[in-house]
Regions:
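Long, charge-rich, low-complexity alpha-helical segments
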Residues: 29-80
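Intrinsically disordered, low-complexity and often Lys/Arg-enriched segments
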Residues: 1-7, 77-80
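A short, structured beta-strand/loop element
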Residues: 5-45
């Protein structure tokens, strides 16, 4: 798995951390935890309270990146 260039500041993959799962940089919190929480209706504020090692900036950067990917995939104008 390769981390997108835009997210290298926020995410990391290290075989020594969480068996090489994609995690928030400097933490042991897998990205999948954020996605699972959002799918369950848990908001960003609650997520960063529950996982204080993940900064709001890290989580928001990933969410924003995902939104851009979706908009691009469905052909929505990215220039806002």
């Amino acid at each position: 798995m390769t981390i997108p260039e835009d997210l290298k500041e926020y995410l990391s993959i290290d075989p020594e951390v969480m068996h090489g799962k994609l995690c928030f940089k400097g933490t042991r919190v897998p990205l999948a935890v954020l996605i699972d929480n959002l799918e369950e209706g848990i908001g960003l504020d609650e997520f960063v309270e529950e996982y204080p090692s993940v900064t709001r900036e890290q989580a928001q950067a990933v969410i924003s990146w995902e939104q851009r990917q979706i908009r691009q995939a469905v052909g929505l104008d990215l220039a806002r």
